[in-house]
Each structure stands twice: as C-alpha cells, then as structure tokens.
UniProtKB/Swiss-Prot annotation:
The gene is ATL13. It comes from the Eukaryota. This is RING-H2 finger protein ATL13. It catalyses: S-ubiquitinyl-[E2 ubiquitin-conjugating enzyme]-L-cysteine + [acceptor protein]-L-lysine = [E2 ubiquitin-conjugating enzyme]-L-cysteine + N(6)-ubiquitinyl-[acceptor protein]-L-lysine. Pathway: Protein modification; protein ubiquitination. The keyword Zinc applies. It holds the Pfam family zf-RING_2. The RING-type zinc finger domain mediates binding to an E2 ubiquitin-conjugating enzyme. It comes from Arabidopsis thaliana. The keyword Transmembrane applies.
Length: 472
C-alpha cells in the first residue's frame, strides 16, 4: 500500500503531538514524602493565640517587677544614720547571714591595721569587778593585755587576735560591719566615715591632691575632719573617733605605750562577756563572775548554749593619746641623701649640724676615695704592651698609697670630730692630693688616638725593616 507524500506529512505531525502530550515532563509530579510530612507538622504545631497572649503577659509582669526591684534597691536605700542604728542593734544571727554575702573577703593591709588605736585594758574607764571576754579567742582580758579598738563600731579585742582576724577579713568579728567605708555614688558625702587609700609609692605624687580634697571637704562641712595623708579614717563624734593617719600622719597610741605624747582623744569602748542562755540571767552572771578555771571548763563545751552578750548598762571609755609627728621628714623609698642636704659646699667650706651629718660626710668622703681608685684602675687597658708591666706595678703602688691615705683620712676624721677646722683642712689636702695623683696618671697614660698612631708607625717601621733585611 502506497502512501502519498502529503499523507505522510499529515501522519508524522500527529505522532509528534501525541509524543509531546505523553512526555513525562508534562505530567504532574507528586510532592515527596518529606515535604508532605513537614507541612502536616507545621499545621499541627501552630501556636494558638491564647497561649501567645499568656506568654506576652508573663514577660510584661517580669519586666515590671525587675524595674520595681531596681527602684527599691537604688532609690529607697536607708540613710547612714539608719545604717548605724542597724549595726548597733544587729543580732548574732543577722551578722552571720550578712557574712554569707562577704565570702570573697581578702582582708586589709597591715599598714591599715597599724593605724587602729591600741591601749591597755587597765586604762579603760568604768570597768566592773568582773573581767570582760575577748570575742575572738574566748579568753578573759587581763590588766596588762593590749587591746586594739575598731573606731567604727567601738568593739575592742586582743591585739594579736584582731590583727590575725583582719589579715583575712575586713569586717568586725562581732557585728560584721565593714571597716572599709562604702564609697559608692549613692552614699551621702557627709557620712560618718571617710576612707582614703593610696599606695606608699604614690604618696609623693598624690600628696598635693589629698590636701586639695581635704580643703574642699572641710569647706563643705566643718564638723567633718578629713585626712590628707595616704591613709585616713575619719569618724563621728558619737563613736569617739577622729583622724587616723599612717605614713606621715599621727597614730593612736596609749599614753603608756607611746613615747612622745600628743593630744588625748576619748573613745567609747563596747565589751561583752559569754553567758549561758539556758540558765537564768542572775545564775549565769554569778557563774560567769566566778574563777577563770570554771570559765575555761565551760568553754570546752559546745558554744550552742552560750552567747556573747554586750554590757549596755556600763559606759566604757578610754583616752588614747596621739603620737607626735617627728620634725624630720622621712625619706621616700629610693631616695638617697644628697651632700647638699648635709651642708656640703663644693668650694671647700663645710657646714656641720650634728654627729649624723659628720658621719654622712665621712661616708661620702670614703666613697669618693673608692670611686677615684676605681677610675684610675679602669685605665689599665689603655696602656701599651711594652709599658704594661712597669706601669701596672707603679699603678698598684699608687693605688696602695691612695687607699692607705684614704684610711688615714677616715682615721683622722674620726679623731677630729670635735675639731671641724682641722678636719676641713685635712679634707682639702686629701682632695688636692687625689686630684694631683689622678692628673699625673692621666699625663703618663697616652690618649687612644696617640697610641693608635704610634702603633701604626711602629708597624710600618717593622715592615720596612723586614723588607730591607730580605734585600740584604
């Protein structure tokens, strides 16, 4: 069967159209299984509006409560007087709870501890017949014991006990009040205590700044005494505390402990005693007033039934005298006394103000002799090889002469302490002799350039002499 060409053209386009219609790209594809499962999960896990509203309300409540907490903490803080009343009426349990928030306490420096007042127990005014107890070592105070007072809370302890305590704590062992004042921005500038700490190395550079700060504070409040040294603690008159300075300032010492006595400052002292809280007050007081052997026996038991009770009925005071500031200024670290401070005159006119200056001049003169000897010996390497042996021997003789003369000079100086004129003449003669010795040694020793020229000239002569000998 024969088909015409036109029929063939009509058949082939139909086949192409059917093939295009049945092609896999034109057929619709089903989505994969993972996409269908994720779409179903999104539809099922959609948050309802009620839950979203509850979350928003809770977040707003937490935000408002945080703002109220900050306002109460920073705007409604108690005043300094209320804080002092709180520390005065604080109980042992409250003090222990407060100590939990000061676990990272690293103590205070020994220089700060040394500035606290020290006195004898027998110097306290108003003592009763029975002795008080130390809250640190749990022992009774004796008449010859040295006590150290904390001016901020007026509590006193054994000197060794409180010193050991303060090296690892910056709070009082009884009331847990901090010895270092809170210098935050929200505190009243006219608070009862002011503490200024500076290192000893920076004292010379900050002394002027401390004086300016003290002048400004005195102008603001005449009742407050401000310390201008590198460590100062200023207290209120209610606690009997005044200025405590270290370094160049005054220190509180008892009149029996300090050598030079200055003004006497009264302090109020708060002491207590361990009493049994299980028994009645009268019976406990009678037991506590007994001999020390019974007290030592009961201290061996648990401290759960005993409490350190402050004696609020009696008013205890102690008068601590301040040590006078010495007229002589202490030398700063790394500072050495200059000859001008001892009255030294380079023209030869010496001034003496005491045995100390004589001793300093003597040491300076001996040091000068040693420096001249070392200067002359250090020029040995400048000498030539031919003259090395002879000049070294002569140099040793001259150094021996200079050292012996230096020893004679110091001997004459020690014998002539009471004759300044003779010592001045001997010192001038010794200086002239040393200058002449040094000048003579320098003239004998050629310069470096001259020795270099001589060495080159000698080498050239040697070369010429060797060439002439070979020619012969």
């Amino acid at each position: 069967m024969k088909f015409s060409r036109e029929n063939m053209k009509w058949v082939f386009p139909e086949i192409k159209t059917t093939q295009n219609f049945l092609s896999p790209s034109s057929l619709p594809q089903e989505p994969p299984l993972s996409l269908r499962s994720s779409a179903n999960f999104d539809l099922n896990s959609k948050i309802s509006p009620s839950i979203l509203l509850i979350i928003i309300i809770l977040s707003i409540i937490f935000f408002i409560s945080g703002l109220l907490h900050l306002l109460v903490r920073f705007l409604l803080t108690p005043s300094s007087r209320d804080r002092e009343d709180y520390f005065d009426n604080v109980t042992a349990l409250q003090g222990q709870l407060q100590q939990l928030f000061h676990l990272h306490d690293s103590g205070v420096d020994q220089s700060f501890i040394d500035t606290l007042p020290v006195f004898h127990y027998k110097s306290i005014i108003g003592l009763k017949n029975y002795p008080f107890d130390c809250a640190v070592c749990l022992c009774e105070f004796e008449t010859e014991d040295k006590l150290r007072l904390l001016p901020k809370c007026s509590h006193a302890f054994h000197m060794d006990c409180i010193d050991t305590w303060l090296l690892s704590h910056s709070t009082c062992p009884l009331c847990r009040s901090s010895l270092l004042s809170d210098l935050s921005s929200h505190q009243d500038p006219r608070s009862s205590f002011l503490l200024v700490l500076e290192s000893a190395s920076d004292h010379s550079s900050r002394e002027i700044g401390g004086d300016r700060d003290s002048a400004a504070c005195v102008a603001a409040n005449d009742d407050i005494d401000v310390s201008s040294a590198h460590l100062g603690l200023v207290g209120n008159n209610d606690l009997g505390s005044t200025r405590i300075d270290s370094g160049h300032g005054d220190q509180y010492l008892d009149g029996e402990l300090g050598g030079s006595v200055g003004k006497v400052v009264p302090f109020s002292v708060k002491l207590g005693k361990f009493r049994n809280i299980d028994i009645g007050e009268g019976t406990s007081s009678n037991n506590n007033i007994g001999n020390s052997s019974s007290l030592d026996e009961r201290r061996c038991f648990s401290m759960g039934s005993y409490e350190y009770i402050m004696d609020e009925e009696t008013t205890l005071k102690v008068h601590v005298s301040t040590k006078k500031q010495s007229s002589k200024n202490r030398g700063l670290p790394g500072h050495r006394t200059a000859m001008s401070e001892c009255g030294f005159d380079p023209t030869g006119r010496l001034k003496f103000s005491g045995s100390g200056s004589m001793r300093i001049v003597e040491e300076a003169a001996e040091k000068n002799v040693v420096e001249r000897e070392s200067f002359s010996v250090s020029k040995i390497w400048l000498r030539g090889k031919k003259e090395k042996h002879s000049k070294v021997q002569g140099k040793e003789d001259s150094s021996l002469v200079s050292s012996s003369s230096g020893r004679a000079f110091s001997f004459r100086l020690s014998n002539q302490r009471n004759h300044p004129d003779a010592m001045i003449e001997s010192g001038c003669e010794e200086d002239n002799q040393k200058c002449e010795n040094s000048e003579s040694l320098e003239t004998k020793t050629p310069s470096f350039a001259r020795r270099t020229m001589l060495w080159l000239a000698g080498r050239q002569n040697k070369v010429v002499h060797s060439s002439s000998s070979t020619n012969v």
